[in-house]
Amino acid sequence: MSVPFPFKTIATAIAFSPYAEANLHESTRIAKMLDANLVLIHVGAKTPEKVEQLELMISQTGIERNKVLVDFRDGDAVKSILESCKENKVNLLIAGAMKKENLIRFYTGSIARKLCRKGRCSILLLTDRSVIRNKCREIVVSGDNHDKTEVTVRTANYFGKILGAEHITIVDEIDPKTGGNAADDDAELEATAHKRKELKKQEDERIAQLENKLEKDGSIPVGHKCIFGKPGYTIGHYAAANKADLLVMNSPDSSLGLMDRVFTHDLEYVLSDLPCCLMIVHQNEKTVA
């Protein structure tokens, strides 16, 4: 089974805004932690003034200059960033994001969230409470019953060790519909309770197997939680309630579009109201964009 780590090439989009310097410093810190090359993507015309300003900003980060590529692009921001990621074989794209989108921005989509919906490399969304500026203590990772989950959990463990995280919780969201319908009498209530108990036992055994596989990678202390609830919404609420520093989830099986926001996809619940920094893990670096 191929894994997307180690992250050898990371990228971030850089704009000349009040947040540019902070974004660059966050990205260079991550690049140094990973011993990775850094691609700085600027969507806009290349001018001597911009080149000079970028060179000054890079020099102030302390990163080795030969590990940084500045890539100027023209055109649509999202398309240009994704094309750069593909051409430069980026493993991890870093973007900043507001924790909560208003209704209009949710339906039209910010650039960061569009990248999450359309990207084909792993993506790290940094919120105002960044895992880089602050100590990373708790990581929550999706334990979905899906072929992608093992790699996602292993990636969370790999990145957690880089960040110096203290604990990982694998959260398995069980859709209540799979555990039986609402009971109308005592007999149905007992049958539903029994079905849910058996289902939880099966899921506990599956997650335990994941934990055993993590031991081979040298795992951070890990625990798991099985929760009956709406997928996406439940894990986001759990991460917020338990003050997680980083939430790690599977990538969507296909690019998300407007209909996924109208009829909410699992990931859209999290993107609409980020509980913390978010990493979306894509499985194969050969399909980057």
Report each predicted region and the residues it spans.
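A conditional alpha-helix N-cap/helix-loop micro-motif detector
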Residues: 20, 74, 105, 149, ...
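Hydrophobic alpha-helical membrane-association signature
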Residues: 23, 50, 152, 203-206, ...
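General small-molecule cofactor/ligand-binding pocket signal
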Residues: 39-41, 69-73, 124, 169-171, ...
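A short acidic, glycine-rich active-site loop
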Residues: 190-202
